[in-house]
Amino acid sequence: MITMRCKMLTAAAVMLAMLTAGCSTLEKVVYRPDINQGNYLSPIDASKIHKGMTQQQVAYTLGTPMLQDPFGTQTWFYVFRQQPGHEKITQQTLTLTFDSSGVLTDIKNEPALTGS
């Protein structure tokens, strides 16, 4: 009778451990790697570009854009998305618009790349 009771308690403990294995209030204990995607641009890189530059000059300074508008407008998008471990996801988008002759006419930096 004692062995049967011991077996039942052991089986119940094993079942309870298996059922609650996925439940954890200690989320930060689990390792999550930093995930960086896109074009990393430092504030120094962003400050090097200005209106009047050609597409070739911009590409030389910043590298190739992550996305170019496929619908005929001369718009380049440099997007950087970062998810550091357990912290909040951040995204920076640098949008550059060129005229028909390939000269930079507009710069949108959201959120702004600032030195920290």
Swiss-Prot record:
Chief localization class? membrane
**Entry-linked PROSITE patterns:** PROKAR_LIPOPROTEIN (PS51257)
Indicate yes or no for the key word DNA repair: no
InterPro entries recorded for this chain? BamE, BamE-like, BamE_dom
**Membrane-protein topology:** Lipid-anchor
Entry GO MF terms: protein-macromolecule adaptor activity
- Lipid positions (N-palmitoyl cysteine): 23
Instruction: Give any Gene Ontology cellular component.
Output: Bam protein complex
Lipid moiety-binding residues (S-diacylglycerol cysteine): 23
- From which residue to which does the signal peptide run? 1-22
Question: Where does this one sit in the cell?
Answer: Cell outer membrane
Keyword Signal applies: yes
Q: Which UniProt keywords apply?
A: Cell outer membrane, Lipoprotein, Membrane, Palmitate, Signal
Cysteine pairs bridged by disulfides in the record: none
Family label: Belongs to the BamE family.
Assembly notes: Part of the Bam complex, which is composed of the outer membrane protein BamA, and four lipoproteins BamB, BamC, BamD and BamE.
Q: Could you tell me what this protein is called?
A: Outer membrane protein assembly factor BamE
Ranked from the top, the taxonomy reads: Bacteria, Pseudomonadati, Pseudomonadota, Gammaproteobacteria, Enterobacterales
